[in-house]
């Protein structure tokens, strides 16, 4: 419980969604009610299922959500349990269930797996990699994501990192993914060191792309020139992938 309190830093204050974005409610397998924002575009578009970082809530990246939607993507951004208007309390197994519930809600609405991109930032990237290991999807895109929580703790706390255990281990899952993956990382990231992003990329065995966000830190990475365009281009390629296997 103490470790969860250190890892998860939720904010319960969520404003009304911006124009063009609607609210959704999603219920998880263990009956937790989650709050989500959804931006839709007409036509058979790729859909990003967005898992955010460990702090704040979905409102913190509203500008990025709108920028991705403006590039022709459907975006479902949900809050983990305990974040924003979502019920419950966050813990590792719980946020994995939350991601699965968000994904499943899109499938029930008729979105095929071949148009779903598991998308995550920081801790949410680990959640997205886990999601892609238990649900079929078209592609995975992660930004500022670490190899494991212990590796992040080792960078900040040295020998004391042993108390973290094996929470949020992306390396354990990424090696087995079979879909294309996009990894972006700021080379001045002061929270999740750049080399962890490089290690995560090296561990991926499938088709992959690495985007080095030059001069970007952890919290300003989406301002890196070309990053949002690169994510959108990578996501739209899922449509071509789906067409090629028909």
List where the protein language model places each region.
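Primarily recognizes the serine-hydrolase "nucleophile elbow" in alpha/beta-hydrolase
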Residues: 105-109, 114-158, 173
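Short beta-strand/loop motif that positions the catalytic acidic residue
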Residues: 177-178, 183-185, 189
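An N-terminal hydrophobic leader/cap segment in hydrolases
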Residues: 1-27, 35, 244-246
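Membrane-embedded segments
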Residues: 29, 33-105, 126
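Catalytic histidine-centered segment of alpha/beta-hydrolase-like enzymes
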Residues: 216-226
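Catalytic active-site module of serine/aspartate enzymes centered on a nucleophile-bearing elbow/loop
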Residues: 224-246
């Amino acid at each position: 419980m103490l470790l969860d309190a250190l890892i998860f830093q939720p904010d319960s204050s969520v404003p009304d969604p911006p124009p063009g974005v609607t609210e959704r409610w999603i219920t998880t397998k263990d009956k937790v009610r989650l709050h989500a924002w959804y931006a839709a575009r007409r036509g058979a578009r790729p859909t990003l299922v967005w898992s955010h970082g460990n702090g704040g809530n979905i409102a913190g990246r509203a500008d990025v959500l709108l920028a991705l939607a403006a590039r022709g993507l459907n975006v479902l951004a949900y809050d983990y349990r305990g974040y924003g208007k979502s019920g419950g309390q966050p813990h590792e197994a719980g946020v994995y269930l939350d991601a699965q519930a968000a994904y499943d809600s899109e499938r029930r609405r008729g979105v095929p797996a071949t148009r779903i991109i598991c998308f995550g930032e920081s801790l949410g990237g680990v959640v997205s990699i886990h999601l892609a290991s238990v649900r079929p999807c078209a592609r995975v895109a992660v930004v500022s994501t670490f190899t494991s929580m212990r590796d992040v703790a080792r960078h900040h706390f040295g020998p004391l990192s042993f108390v973290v255990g094996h929470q949020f281990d992306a390396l354990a899952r990424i090696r087995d993914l079979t879909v294309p993956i996009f990894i972006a990382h700021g080379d001045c990231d002061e929270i999740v060191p750049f080399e962890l992003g490089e290690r995560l990329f090296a561990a991926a065995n499938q088709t992959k792309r690495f985007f080095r966000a030059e001069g970007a830190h952890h919290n300003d990475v989406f301002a890196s020139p070309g990053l949002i365009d690169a994510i959108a281009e990578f996501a739209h390629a899922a449509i071509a992938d789906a067409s090629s296997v028909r």
